[in-house]
Amino acid sequence: MGAGGDKPKTTSHLKTPACPYPIYSNSISDYGLYGYTDAPKIMNESVTVSARGTIGYVCLRHIPYVPIVRLVTLIPNTDILSAKYLYLFLSHRNITGTGTTQQQLTVPDFSKTEIPIPDKQIMTSFTEIVTPFFQQIWANEEENEKLTEVRDTLLPKLMSGELDVSRLDI
């Protein structure tokens, strides 16, 4: 368990070959995506929890990334429990912080959270059952990204008349 650090030196607002790894912050919009960078800090499937502002926003991360700015990162010991189980458990809890002016969640506070751990066979079966659902979600998200890119490329060309579609039989 750890807290997100400073923003990396090399960043881009767009995903590029030089900056292919997402940077996540404690925001709730766009799953907390802040930008992209050239080197990930977290390589394993993990769970992040926003720790300031919108406290308790839980995300399952399955690709290498960099956590920044008040984002608690949980990398489970996969011999004991899966990130998918941890994500589903935490996403159904009311996670709160401490503080009077601005609520915040600290790693020491969060480490007190009790997580029921089923035996290994049940955990393995559970993970095998839910994995295809997550894989489908991730495939859909990837397809949405590609479709957004196509839309953003084609729409300006259609609007400017650069791409003529008047002869299409629709």
Where are these regions (language model features)?
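DNA target-recognition domains and sequence-specific DNA-contacting regions of bacterial/archaeal
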Residues: 1-118, 169
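Amphipathic alpha-helical coiled-coil/heptad-repeat segments
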Residues: 79-81, 92, 96-98, 103, ...
